[in-house]
Amino acid sequence: MSRLLALLALAPLLAGAAETTAPKPPSAFTVEAQRRVEAELPFADRADFERADRGLIRRPERLLIRNPDGSVAWQLGGYDFLLDGKPRDSINPSLQRQALLNLKYGLFEVAEGIYQVRGFDLANITFIRGDSGWIVVDTLTTPATARAAYELVSRELGERPIRTVIYSHAHADHFGGVRGLVEPQQVASGAVQIIAPAGFMEAAIKENVLAGNAMMRRATYQYGTQLPKGPQGQVDMAIGKGLARGPLSLLAPTRLIEGEGEDLVLDGVPFTFQNTPGTESPAEMNIWLPRQKALLMAENVVGTLHNLYTLRGAEVRDALGWSKYINQALHRFGRQAEVMFAVHNWPRWGNAEIVEVLEKQRDLYGYLHDQTLHLANQGVTIGQVHNRLRLPPSLDQEWYDRGYHGSVSHNARAVLNRYLGYYDGNPATLDPLSPEDSAGRYVEYMGGAERLLEQARASYARGEYRWVVEVVNRLVFAEPDNRAARELQADALEQLGYQAENAGWRNSYLSAAYELRHGVPRDQPTMKAGSADALAAMDTGLLFDYLGVRLDAGAAEGKALSINLRLPDIGENYLLELKNSHLNNLRGVQSEDAGQTVSIDRADLNRLLLKEVSAVRLVFEGKLKSSGNPLLLGQLFGMLGDFDFWFDIVTPAAKSEG
């Protein structure tokens, strides 16, 4: 049997020899792995499909949403292949189930006066009926999708103005569409209020700025943005179908929920807000609606194990704190709740079920925290813990605890990293060579490229795909132009992608295979680390911190300058000092020894940094005033580098020339 599997496993390699860039079919080992999943999980439980359809008011026959410039912001037609329910051997059956559930889009009634539009973006948008208008919780990613959701609600439920916008937390898929619902003038006049958890603006901006370019490039892997939709491509994103495309917007909150939370009455509707900082977002809050006995758990309890560490990159989240906040919600609200819903996936009804889900999600994050550290305290390292830790059956067999978004594997490593860091304690790993420097030596020790490939192909034929990608990665980094190595690496990554239950893992594996076969798509549009709204909302100190990240240390070597910067429209002064190839900024300080003093409104500084206007034009218009050496600010800006979005990931990074 094992020999037959090996021969069948080699068939995709041989069949694909004529067209090496095309996706390969699932191997016999992958098919066998999918059958094991079907046997191990409770697929007879179809209750989630009833939940995901419950309360449906309207499901548009064709969902295609365009941005104002005519580009496609969102469409679901590419996922029609899922609708026949036929098992696909190139998709993990558990992930395929989640992918089909996330296709349940449209306008739904959750409870009396509470409605959700689901499937118009990665997240859900919630409309709560007030005395005179709508209270909206979360605004999707981009104005086009938010506007389309609001138009659907208006058609089906009647036209009503929006009185309040609530941001549940500080991630872009929950605030980026706000300008599709309300105008800045409505907020400025007080006609619309915006409510958010304490720390919202700092969290919304800071998390995505300083390392924003790297995060967004890595997000192309996690979300599979380069992949075609299909059985051998992108099928889902666990908490939704994928990312909407279009500009982000951001309007600052007019009221923050402070402390542990607050009780408010909004347009006649009573709300209780529970702040949960440091859970799924640095600033996040659950919402209790006592009139309907409805509990909105933000993104703290959704239809999957969530990320303690997200593959795009971010600070590691606090598993223990997350567990404790769920426990608080359970005891404050959960034992009264008759409906529980969230900003992703579908609701749940009935108190007994709600209590059980809250308990098991609480214990899911608590178990990951405690048992990871239990192993760590026995000497298990960050390179081992993901192969040791397993969930108990009472958690593992619940669909909402499965690892579609987070995974036990990468979450366990995240917990260990949060407490002990990346170093495993073994001095052999304390000061490693860079992969591109060690790769050639590994290949030499293994007998050269041909011998390595010969053995790797044999491992591939045995279905040892994890081992193949570990070994062949060395050869790809030693010889990035070795076509045979790239093809074998892509084939092995692809099989891992087909087998992955986790949507981010699948997308990452398949994106890596795509780039190994086709190269990095440098001609594709790039994602921006910040929009004009984001820049305007950014604290000035953070703005200058970001300029420090952009500083080209080589260009700044040996240079020293100091600039007094005055921002009269916001009443702030900063001292900028460049020394030792580092840019310092200090608020509220001016130096008599500064080489230049510049006065410019913060709004005009934003325009200058966005390259909407030149410094010469601002001087001519009297909007930039300077004394001392007039060249220093220009010299400083001339040392700022721009980041290449499409940097290499699965091959050695190109050497910088500067």
From Swiss-Prot:
Any one GO molecular-function label of the UniProt entry: identical protein binding
Q: Which cofactor does it need?
A: Zn(2+)
Please tell me where Zn(2+) 2 binds in this chain: 173-174, 299, 344
> Any binding details for the cofactor?
Binds 2 Zn(2+) ions per subunit.
GO:BP terms for this protein? dodecyl sulfate metabolic process
The coiled-coil segments of this chain are none
Where along the chain is Zn(2+) 1 bound? 169, 171, 280, 299
**Knocked-out gene: effects:** Insertion mutant cannot grow with SDS as a sole carbon and/or sulfur source. Disruption of the gene leads to a decrease in the growth in mucin minimal medium and a reduction in the degradation of both carbohydrate and protein moieties in mucin. Mutant shows reduced swimming, swarming and twitching motilities and decreased mucin gel penetration ability. Virulence of the mutant is attenuated in leukopenic mice compared with the wild-type strain.
Q: GO cellular component annotations, sorted alphabetically? A: outer membrane-bounded periplasmic space
Q: Write down a Pfam family by its short name.
A: Alkyl_sulf_dimr
Report the induction information: Up-regulated in mucin minimal medium.
Leader sequence residues:
1-17
| Keywords of this entry | Hydrolase, Metal-binding, Periplasm, Signal, Virulence, Zinc
What does the annotation say about its assembly with partners? Homodimer.
PANTHER family found in the cross-reference section? ALKYL/ARYL-SULFATASE, ALKYL_ARYL-SULFATASE BDS1
Q: What is known of its domains?
A: Contains three distinct domains: an N-terminal catalytic domain that contains a binuclear Zn(2+) cluster, a central dimerization domain that ensures resistance to high concentrations of SDS and a C-terminal domain that provides a hydrophobic groove, presumably to recruit long aliphatic substrates. Although separated by the dimerization domain in terms of sequence, the N-terminal and C-terminal domains are spatially directly adjacent.
* Its job: Alkylsulfatase that cleaves both short and medium-length alkylsulfates, including the widely used detergent sodium dodecyl sulfate (SDS). Acts in vitro on primary alkylsulfates such as decyl sulfate, octyl sulfate and hexyl sulfate, but not on sulfated sugars and arylsulfates. The hydrolysis of SDS allows the bacterium to use SDS as a sole carbon or sulfur source. In addition, contributes to the in vivo virulence of P.aeruginosa by playing a central role in the degradation of mucin, a glycoprotein that is the primary component of the mucus overlaying the host epithelial tissues.
Identification of the protein by name: Linear primary-alkylsulfatase
